[in-house]
Amino acid sequence: MEKLLPKAKQAEFHRLKLAKKQQLTKNTFALEFEIPEALKLNYKFEAGQYVTVKYPSKGVVFQNDFSMTSAPYEEKISLGIKINNDASSTQDLFDNIDVGDEVDVSEPKGRFTLVSKPHEFRTIIGFAGGIGITPLISHFKNILHTEPRTRLFMFYGNRKSEEIAFKNEIL
């Protein structure tokens, strides 16, 4: 008989203030949200998780999932976001959100996580393309911070060199 997974609990949203907004390439940008002291426990996360952001675009409220690039020890929520085209809702998000604005952000979720093994010697290889690099940045930052014996290798592809998001962080 199949073992059924428990139903996921409904995501809880909280208003978070945008602390930083940065255009990375023509088609990607990063957002960084402050976590108020009262919500620190709600936003405790593991590297590799994601959040859902609610934002208005063209008269409709969108909900999109974005992987975090921040590591747990940083105590902030940083996201990498791709703009698919000029008419996309993510283009509106970039154009219309400013530092200091508040946005509904879900508590972290997702199971693309790793068990930390700080006392072991191990090698981890990551593969990513385009904006798919975001959860790996979170993982690699966390591993570099907590696992001194772990070796990291990354294979990362993009169509064009000018489309490399987070170039400074990964070089």
Annotate the PLM regions.
Residues 165-171:
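Short, aromatic/basic amphipathic alpha-helical patches
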Residues 48, 130-134:
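Gly/Ser/Thr-rich loops at beta-strand to alpha-helix junctions
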Residues 68, 133-145:
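Histidine-anchored nucleotide/phosphate-binding helix
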Residues 120-121, 142-152:
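Conserved S-adenosyl-L-methionine
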Residues 107-120:
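A short, basic/flexible loop-to-alpha-helix module at the beginning of a structural domain
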Residues 125-127:
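Conserved beta-strand elements of the Class I
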Residues 2-102, 106, 122, 150, ...:
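Ferredoxin-reductase
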